[in-house]
Each structure stands twice: as structure tokens, then as C-alpha cells.
Amino acid sequence: GFEINTVKVTDYNAAVEAMRAGRADIAWYGGKTYIKAAEIADAEAFAAGVRPGEKNANYFAYFVVKADSQIKSFSEVKGKTLSLNTIGSTSGDLIPQVELSKINLSTTNKKHFKNVFYAGSHDACLLSVLNDQADVCGMSSRNFEARLADNTFRMEQVRIIHRSDPVPPPPLAYSKKISLKDRQKIKKAVLEAHNYGTIGGY
């Protein structure tokens, strides 16, 4: 067996740096961050989570407004205050940026939005809308569903004005600096873990 030590990091880029510097051997990355980790930190994806009862792990980026918002369609976000997750987040930054570009909007163009800010997490992004700090937020459907399930908010409080195309799930990756033998053991343990208990988390 292996002795496991957990390292908490502040953001996605810190997770990449931890593996690059040898402070972390395994990390759960967002899709965008994994590409960077594979390029500079010798990361190799080997698993992705699938929730019980689901056939695939794809999810979406949602654009969410309050139920009583004057914003009725996605194109009406122009000129409003937008909140996102964190820089480097797949469903809370990259995919929202891509979706906005499809309607010729950019978060870096000051003429397109009244204000754009990063809330720091998907949950904080949602709360920024509920607390009237932002008109619209771009966030992960996974977190939206989780907060709905734990009664952080009620569905009648909000509206989803846009949903992205399906997004591949965030991969669990290990460093190629780990021996092949140990990587195979880790992969086997992770892929069989659901046979021995319930796995929670992201």
C-alpha cells in the first residue's frame, strides 16, 4: 500500500505547480488546467468520476441570473455585471469565455460588460447573483446541482439563460515521474474503489 498525504492548494495553477515541483504526485485538474499540467508537469490522466446512475461524466457551463432579472436571453448579458469562478477554471472561465465569443462578446472588452470579476469558486459565483453583486454568473452545472440539492437556493430563485455544449469531466492525473509499476497500482486502486465504498467529492 501507499501512505497518502494531502496537499491543499489555492487555485488550479497552484495544483500544476505542485506537481511540476514534485510536491504532489496525483491531482484532480479541470480540463483546461490538465492540458497545461500535461505540457509542463508530466501529468497523465488516468480516471474521471462518474456519478451513480449516470452513463457518462460530461457536464455543462451554465449562465445563471435571478428569477426576477430583466435579462431574458443570453444575448442580453451585454452591459451587465458578470461573475466567473477563478482564472483557469474550465466551466467557470474558459467555457463561458467561449460561449460569450459566439455572440461576439469578450470579458476583456470594457464596452461589452459593466464589470467582470472572479468570485473565487463556483459556489461564490452563484451567491454573487443571489446576493445582487452580479447580474449573471458563469458556473459549473455540477456545482449548481449540488447547491440545489443541499438547499443553498431554490430553483424558483434563479433562471438558467444559457447552457454550453457538453464539457468532458475533470480528470484525475498522476505524475509520469512515478514508476510505471506504482502508476498501475494507483490506477487499479482508483478504478476499483467504488466496489469498497461510496466515493464523494467534486
Where are each of the predicted segments found?
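A ligand-binding cleft/hinge motif common to bilobed small-molecule-binding domains
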Residues: 28-42, 96-102, 127-156
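Periplasmic-binding protein-like
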Residues: 47, 52-62, 150-196, 200-202
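N-terminal hydrophobic or amphipathic helices and topogenic motifs
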Residues: 1-14, 200-202
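General small-molecule cofactor/ligand-binding pocket signal
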Residues: 5-7, 116-117, 159-161
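Bilobed "Venus flytrap"/periplasmic-binding protein-like clamshell domains
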Residues: 1, 32, 53-126, 142, ...
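Short beta-strand-centered segments that line the small-molecule binding cleft or hinge
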Residues: 25-27, 35-60
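Short helices/loops that flank or line small-molecule/ion binding pockets
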Residues: 8, 13-27, 40-41, 59, ...
